């Protein structure tokens, strides 16, 4: 059975909701899913998964959230060849660097040798119906790439 690992950072609950939507779709598609908050796991846990997903918010003027910086740095040192990855997240279009943390994780994953399974999904603040559709399509694309 395909295993997806989702690691998230969430301050307001918006990004955790994003992670849960993706996880629910994975389960609907018959994928085993582990969902964990970024401070409770190690980046090396992605080595056990077929699909690796990070869900993060962007803090302030484009910074990674403090709580996910160590995870990000550890991820950069991994060899994830043969893995499929995807990145989703929330931000605020009020800022010039909308969802920059999503872009940062996208580049970080690419440097690990993992294969990008879907375009990143960026949500403005909280999840709307159109975002749910994009997040579910994101999950479907990752599963299709992994199988």
PLM regions: where:
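Aromatic-flanked redox-active Cys/Sec active sites in thiol-based oxidoreductases
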Residues: 8-12
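FMN-binding flavodoxin-like domain, especially the glycine-rich phosphate-binding loop
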Residues: 2-3, 14-17, 25-29, 34-36, ...
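Short acidic active-site motifs
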Residues: 40-45
